[in-house]
Amino acid sequence: MQLNVNDAQAIEVSELTFGGEFNETLVHQAVVAYMAGGRQGSKQQKTRSDVRGGGKRPWRQKGTGRARAGTIRSPIWRGGGTTFAARPQDHSQKLNKKMYRAALRSILAELVRTDRLVVVQDFAVESPKTKDLLGKLNNMSLTDVLIVSEAVDQNLYLAARNLPHVDVRDVQGSDPVSLIAYDKVLITVSAVKKFEELLG
């Protein structure tokens, strides 16, 4: 299949990588797994056994007329432990490499199908100035965009750093969440070839 390139001839690309069907279930699974892997999972609360004190019972079992109490750190009491206390846990989900690659192929194919993939021969800025990058993007009518190149250009990265709706990634650093989070994905021809090499 062919991909149109801005201000250049169309390029021939793999049907497998850029022309497959959209597998929504698989993409959802990949996105959930990716986001779950980013969770810190370090929250911790104290149960009645973790809270300091509460070893001696506050009053005797019988004869006071009050309700029975065995510890001042009971979850019912103020200053007591938490009933179902949170514990540190690993939230990461297993996703096979084969499934992950298939999800990326599915996302790329959907980007092509919905005209959200903008292919350019090359994309760079001469100096690390946000104003210069913004001018280039405005000329292409791009406001909410992910820029993907084979390797991240330092000037481009610095110029985009202060723009809330622009992100710069290399092919290796592209993930399912970033690829679907933006209105458009601006990608260089060399990055397209790299994707074919990795996902083909």
Swiss-Prot record:
GO terms for cellular component: ribonucleoprotein complex; ribosome. GO terms for biological process: translation. One of its GO terms (molecular function) is structural constituent of ribosome. Belongs to the universal ribosomal protein uL4 family. Coiled coil: none annotated. Residues 38-68 are annotated as: Disordered. It holds the Pfam family Ribosomal_L4. Residues 54-65 have a biased composition (Basic residues). This is Large ribosomal subunit protein uL4. Keywords: Ribonucleoprotein, Ribosomal protein, RNA-binding, rRNA-binding. It comes from Pseudomonas fluorescens (strain SBW25). NCBIfam families: rplD_bact. Part of the 50S ribosomal subunit. InterPro entries: Ribosomal_uL4, Ribosomal_uL4-like, Ribosomal_uL4_dom_sf. PANTHER family: 50S RIBOSOMAL PROTEIN L4, LARGE RIBOSOMAL SUBUNIT PROTEIN UL4M. The gene is rplD. One of the primary rRNA binding proteins, this protein initially binds near the 5'-end of the 23S rRNA. It is important during the early stages of 50S assembly. It makes multiple contacts with different domains of the 23S rRNA in the assembled 50S subunit and ribosome. It comes from the Bacteria.
